[in-house]
């Protein structure tokens, strides 16, 4: 993943004005509580529209306020794992994992699903309801769902 980001966004009295370039690999944003890290992640994912800015992910412009470009979240190929884990309570772990695939109209790749399930140690949990999972298990299911969507960028 490579990203070019330049955004300006006001939330009440708070002004977020940031510009950075992230090359392929792992990039981390550090800062104190309230510094705007989550706001930046939400703008990258397309959940929040900044007042001004431009975002290029993997060479594709997903936001350019000057040109009226806004690619919606579901078309950004961005996987997002929220701070507060969000699973569908009426679905099994397996159905939660496959949700992103179904939303994108993809056919499930059994080998990739098995690889992610093994990687995250979810083999024995697939038929469980989220209400019967520990916090860590819920986090692993949410991460698996994001990974199975084969995102260009994974936002945690």
Residue ranges and their predicted role:
Residues 62-79, 103:
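ABC ATPase NBD coupling module
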Residues 60-65, 108-125:
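Conserved ABC ATPase "signature" region
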Residues 129-133, 137:
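Conserved ABC ATPase signature
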Residues 91, 95-110, 119:
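ABC-type ATPase nucleotide-binding domains, specifically the catalytic core motifs of the NBD
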Residues 154-156:
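Catalytic Walker B motif of ABC-type/P-loop ATPase nucleotide-binding domains
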Residues 148-152:
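A short, proline-enriched helix->beta-strand linker immediately N-terminal to the Walker B motif
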Residues 143:
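Hydrophobic anchor residue at the start of the ABC signature
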């Amino acid at each position: 993943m490579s990203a070019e980001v330049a955004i300006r966004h006001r939330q009440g009295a708070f002004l977020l004005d940031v510009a950075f370039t992230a090359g392929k690999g792992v990039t981390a944003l550090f800062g104190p509580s309230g510094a705007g890290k989550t706001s930046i992640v939400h703008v990258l994912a397309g959940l929040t529209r900044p007042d001004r800015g431009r975002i290029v992910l993997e060479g594709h412009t997903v936001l350019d306020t000057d040109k009226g470009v806004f690619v919606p979240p579901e078309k950004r190929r961005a996987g997002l794992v929220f701070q507060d884990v969000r699973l569908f309570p009426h679905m099994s772990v397996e159905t939660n994992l496959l949700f992103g695939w179904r939303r994108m109209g993809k056919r499930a790749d059994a080998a990739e699903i098995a690889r992610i399930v093994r990687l995250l140690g979810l083999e024995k949990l697939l038929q469980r309801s989220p209400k019967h999972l520990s916090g860590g298990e819920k986090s692993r299911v949410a991460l698996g769902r994001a990974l199975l969507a084969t995102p260009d960028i994974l936002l945690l």
